Amino acid sequence: MYIAPVICAVLLLFAGGAAAQQGGKPIQKATITLGTATPGGGFPLYGNNFAQVMNDADPTLSIEPRNTKGSYENIPLLESGQLDLALVAGEPAYEAFKGIGRPATHLKILTAMYSSPGMFVVRADSPYRTIRDLKGQPIAFGAKGSGLPVMSRFMLDGIDLKQDEDFKSVYLDHAGDGPAMVLDGRVAALWGAGIGWPGFTTLAASPAGARFIAPGADEIARVIAKHPFLKPMTVPAGSYPNQNAPIDSIGSWSFVLTRADLADDVAYRLARTLNGSEGALCKKLGQACETTAANTLAAAPDVALIHPGAMKYFREIGVVK
């Protein structure tokens, strides 16, 4: 997908009568591009709601969501200045910050989005009940370029399974393609992550029903011992239709990242607006209730990775000293 370059970080919009006015004078309006992912997944859902809430809270902001191929495209688009902000899953962010398989990035964290406990979903009438039951079966591991297949790869490696050897791996062109493939039998299971993740919601609400498969307690311990950046997480009961019990699993935090040279005053303004909009964002999207300043400090691999402009605001409100 072609994305037009961002000509400048902050664009002054003086579109006649459409320009924001204060006391009869035009107000500087910041146009911010936000990369999400392919349609039908959790990132576009989050990104669209994030943009709407932020724009409503501050009429001098214009955050524009853009569909992309996901985390692995968003990182280079940020690095090349073609995006100002982007949603990035925990595993690609971890690899980029640590320089795993690539040079270490200089991108910064604006906010933690939400925790993403990973698990598989199968039809309710499926014979499969454990991860090892799924060996040899066609599994949809998520969209190409997204962080989901990376999380599953780390998780499976932690229990001595190889994603592309022990399973018939299927990588989707669009995240929204997965549920239909489970329902019609093209794949035995779909891998996903998060609370209220659209693919899981679709399957759980379908007439066929759904059952979730997550690592067992021993498997969780093994995964965390080998890949400590993955954390134990729980999907609360009621997160999906007909899900009557909590589900323990592992996962990571996703982030809103900024390009390295995003101005401090812009990041400060975004952090301030977001902090004041936490309640509104939570009402629009359940998993966005985790988008808080406190969670950002807790989830960041290193506080030095948080944008200095955001950190300035966090100090002002006493979240960090």
Which residues make up each language-model segment?
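Ligand-binding clefts/hinges and TM-proximal coupling segments of bilobed small-molecule sensing domains
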Residues: 141-155, 230-299
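A structural signal for short loop-to-beta-strand junctions that line the ligand-binding cleft
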Residues: 102-113, 239-248
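N-terminal signal peptide c-region/cleavage motif recognized by signal peptidases
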Residues: 15-17
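An extracytoplasmic/periplasmic, membrane-proximal ligand-sensing/linker region
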Residues: 177, 184-185, 194-212, 222-229, ...
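Pocket-lining segment of extracytoplasmic ligand-binding domains
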Residues: 90-92, 126-127, 163-262
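Pocket-flanking alpha-helical
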Residues: 48-52, 64-104, 120, 176-182, ...
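Bilobed "Venus flytrap"/periplasmic-binding protein-like clamshell domains
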Residues: 31-57, 61, 115-184, 279, ...
